[in-house]
């Protein structure tokens, strides 16, 4: 069986590698080819749980959706989830290996090459094309010796590379030239094309620069993509900088999301952002908080540390004040834990803080332990069937002054019967371990209509928004954007030249 490969690397983080890889996945899938995305090592706090209960990075999930296939942990065999500025949880083939500091991991990571290549080779055996993505920049010369994700991975897969450069930040030609010239000659020769991304204005103004960079590097500029408002899941928390900080006064409902320092799985909020009557804003300070209709405390990779920070910056007090003044509150995973009475970490799983008081809005107590729960789950709340996934270390017990949020009926395809989450006695505070809770359109609209009625507004009917249908539309737009702004003859030739038996 023959297989083709193409790899996107960037001059910096957030250059657009993930998006362009997704675009190519959709283009090739639309041609009828079997396509799989691949990123050997991903560092992200946004993760996903597969049908088999394996944890993987979110970017390869939306790339798999673009490729019209189910997410498979082989698409992202190594996932690093930072827990502090120096330490990360190392996840190999979907399961926790251990926590490691940066120096230890740098010395260790080449031992992971057999697992990486097993994942890559088995995907290559099953697909027509593998679309690879690098991480950050391939020109980090202090890290290149043990590289397993950029040119190191390109060499292992013998994949041609497209270099993606973000012009919106300025200095695009310097970043292209510097990135290429810092590479060994062998790696420079692997780059077959350059794409300039996020351009605003008249492309003709770039032509002289494109010709000059082609002459300086010997590599053709095969495309210039415009800045786009296409709405695809973001993986890097740097993308939160672009999120709204103020309410859209044209929308009926004000939803405020606490922008935690160690925020994770902020993709949970995406389904609310596309609702016709909802304005979503991200809150960094107590002054910004106000009294939203719905206040969301999202997931956290270090719940104890984020709770300490919330108290220091005054947001904890602001949350309590907002609730007193009428805001409904939903906590997801770490946010659920924060809403409780107490958090215990006797063995230092998350942090040196052995115990601390929560915000006290739910009658729950959480104890962190080494066992990590990773499941795809199906739950029921009242008459609503809810689908989501769990990623947490520790257990939460409810007291007498709260009721379960839902009953888990299935995990990883197997029957289950256990309770999840908690709801305050007055129904104004909800906590759940289910990520993706707002991706359930009927329950979400029910919740939003409750908020509307509380404000004296009529509920919206026949306005449920399917996140899956919405995403599919965005992938088609992304594929079209790529095809219209890239020299597809040159791109197809690069892909064709990569063919291997």
Curated annotation (Swiss-Prot):
UniProt xrefs under InterPro entries: Class_I_gatase-like, CobQ/CobB/MinD/ParA_Nub-bd_dom, CobQ_GATase1, CobQ_N, CobQ_synth, GATase_3, P-loop_NTPase
Gene3D superfamilies named among the record's database cross-references: 3.40.50.880, P-loop containing nucleotide triphosphate hydrolases
Pfam families per UniProt: CbiA, GATase_3
Annotated S-S bridges: none
Highest taxon above the source species: Bacteria
Pathway(s) it belongs to: Cofactor biosynthesis; adenosylcobalamin biosynthesis
Active site, per annotation: 333 (nucleophile), 435
Keywords: Cobalamin biosynthesis, Glutamine amidotransferase
GATase cobBQ-type domain span: 252-443
GO molecular function, one term: catalytic activity
Gene Ontology process terms (BP): cobalamin biosynthetic process
HAMAP family noted in UniProt: CobQ
Function, in words: Catalyzes amidations at positions B, D, E, and G on adenosylcobyrinic A,C-diamide. NH(2) groups are provided by glutamine, and one molecule of ATP is hydrogenolyzed for each amidation.
Family membership: Belongs to the CobB/CobQ family. CobQ subfamily.
Protein's name in the database: Cobyric acid synthase
Organism encoding this protein: Limosilactobacillus reuteri (strain DSM 20016) (Lactobacillus reuteri)
Gene name linked to the record: cobQ
């Amino acid at each position: 069986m023959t297989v083709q490969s193409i790899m996107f690397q960037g001059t910096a983080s957030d250059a657009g590698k993930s998006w362009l890889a997704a675009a190519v996945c959709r283009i090739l899938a639309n041609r009828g080819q079997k396509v799989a995305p691949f990123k050997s090592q991903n560092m992200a706090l946004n993760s996903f749980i597969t049908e088999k209960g394996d944890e993987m990075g979110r970017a390869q999930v939306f790339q798999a959706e673009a490729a019209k296939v189910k997410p498979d942990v082989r698409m992202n065999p190594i996932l690093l989830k930072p827990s502090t500025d120096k330490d990360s949880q190392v996840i190999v083939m979907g399961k926790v290996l251990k926590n490691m500091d940066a120096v230890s991991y740098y010395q260790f990571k080449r031992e992971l090459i057999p697992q990486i290549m097993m994942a890559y080779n088995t995907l290559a055996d099953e697909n027509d094309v593998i679309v690879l993505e690098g991480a950050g920049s391939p020109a980090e010369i202090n890290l290149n010796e043990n590289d397993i994700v950029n040119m190191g991975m390109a060499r292992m897969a013998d994949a041609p590379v497209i270099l993606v450069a973000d012009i919106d930040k300025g200095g695009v030609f310097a970043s292209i030239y510097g990135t290429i010239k810092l590479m060994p000659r062998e790696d420079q020769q692997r780059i077959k094309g350059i794409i300039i991304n996020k351009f605003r204005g008249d492309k003709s103004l770039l032509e002289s620069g494109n010709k000059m960079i082609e002459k300086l590097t010997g590599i053709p500029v095969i495309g210039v993509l415009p800045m786009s408002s296409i709405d695809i899941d973001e993986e890097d928390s740097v993308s939160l900088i672009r999120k709204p900080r103020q309410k859209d006064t044209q929308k009926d409902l004000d939803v405020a999301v606490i922008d935690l320092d160690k925020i994770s799985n902020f993709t949970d909020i995406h389904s609310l952002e596309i609702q016709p009557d909802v304005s979503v804003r991200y809150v960094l300070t107590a002054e910004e908080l106000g009294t939203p209709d719905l206040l969301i405390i999202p997931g956290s990779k270090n719940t104890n540390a984020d709770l300490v920070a919330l108290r220091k910056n005054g947001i904890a007090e602001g949350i309590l004040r907002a609730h007193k003044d009428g805001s409904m509150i939903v906590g997801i995973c770490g946010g659920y834990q924060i809403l409780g009475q107490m958090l215990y970490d006797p063995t230092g799983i998350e942090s040196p803080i052995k115990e601390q008081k929560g915000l006290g809005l739910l009658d729950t107590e959480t104890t962190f332990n080494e066992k990590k729960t990773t499941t795809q789950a199906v739950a029921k709340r009242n008459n609503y069937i809810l689908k989501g996934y769990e990623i947490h270390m520790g257990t939460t017990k409810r007291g007498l002054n709260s009721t379960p949020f839902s009953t888990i009926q299935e995990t990883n395809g197997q029957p289950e019967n256990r309770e999840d989450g908690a709801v305050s006695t007055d129904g104004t505070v909800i906590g759940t371990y289910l990520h993706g809770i707002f991706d359930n359109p009927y329950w979400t609209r029910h919740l939003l209509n409750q908020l509307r009625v509380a404000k004296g507004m009529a509920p919206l009917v026949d306005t449920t928004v399917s996140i899956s249908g919405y995403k599919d539309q965005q992938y088609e737009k992304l594929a079209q954007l790529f095809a219209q702004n890239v020299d597809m003859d040159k791109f197809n030739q690069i892909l064709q030249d990569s063919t291997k038996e």
